[in-house]
Design a protein with these regions (language model features):
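Conserved cytosolic headpiece of P-type ATPases
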Residues: 1-259
Length: 259
């Protein structure tokens, strides 16, 4: 069981599983191949992508459109052609810096594999497919001030980094249906004069579009993850409450979704 990376909290559970005859799971791939893969993505609101025609629940979803979404969807291999370099760099940082997954060699095959979280592995593989830099470079080049571990209450994980301009940035990845409710802006496909990412306010129409996108993915048994961030001049921010274990509260109500 150790070789298979199986953690058993209670020994009685082994006997329970030995008598199980049916296993029901809501995520495809975790049982069949023991891995997860990014098959669709949305950047901001208007840029949507899907992998080459794939099937879910017996039905095919082509890259021409995603049911319930607004507008057509491009090929998942082409986000670099549709978004700015600034937005691509931000997305890459949100994926790599916040993750604790590392790369190692498989003792049986000798191939390079990612170790730990299956979800993080899927995101890191997706970043590699797009030709973004490796995992180590962003982490080594980033001054990480605080890691905020995953919590089942907020269903998200966070990381605070210090920016070259002296400011601070909070990255948050997690359940999209929760994180997007606290977001005030979304990432637009543009760049500011200072080389940052252009953002636009989330109004009712934009909020409905984001909600529709999330529901569309969920209807195809997909796990939807939101990549969000917020910049601060100081960390911890003024008015924030720091708990005994060093965790900062009341800072997760804003961000820019980049699903």
């Amino acid at each position: 069981m150790t070789r298979e990376n199986i953690f058993v909290r209670s020994l009685e559970s082994c006997e329970t599983m030995a008598n199980a005859s049916v296993i029901c799971a809501d995520k495809t791939g975790t049982l069949t191949q023991n891995e997860m893969t990014v098959v669709a993505a949305s950047v901001g609101i208007h840029a949507k992508f899907v992998r080459k025609p794939y099937r879910f629940l017996g039905g095919e979803v082509s890259r021409g459109s995603i049911p319930g979404n607004f507008g057509p969807a491009g090929d998942l291999s082409s986000p670099n052609l549709a978004i700015t370099p600034e937005l691509a760099k931000l997305s890459h940082a949100a994926i790599t810096v916040i993750s604790t997954t590392f790369e190692d060699l498989d003792p049986e095959t000798g191939a390079a594999v990612f170790i730990r979280s299956k979800t993080d592995t899927a995101l890191l593989k997706f970043a590699r497919e797009l030709g973004w830099t490796d995992v180590k470079h962003p982490r080594e080049a980033t001054n990480i001030l605080q890691m905020i571990p995953f919590s089942s209450d907020r269903r998200s994980v966070g990381c605070v980094v210090k920016l070259p301009n002296g400011g601070h940035r909070l990255y948050i990845n997690g359940a999209s249906e929760l994180l997007t409710k606290g977001c005030t802006h979304y990432a637009a496909n543009g760049a500011t004069r200072g080389g940052g990412v252009e953002t636009a306010p989330i109004g009712k129409a934009e909020g409905d579009s984001i909600s529709c996108t999330i529901k569309s993915y969920a209807s195809h048994a997909l796990r939807t993850i939101a990549l969000c961030y917020r910049d601060f001049s100081h960390w911890p921010p003024n008015g924030a409450r720091v708990t005994d274990n060093g965790e900062v509260r009341k800072v997760f109500l804003f961000g820019t979704p980049n699903v």
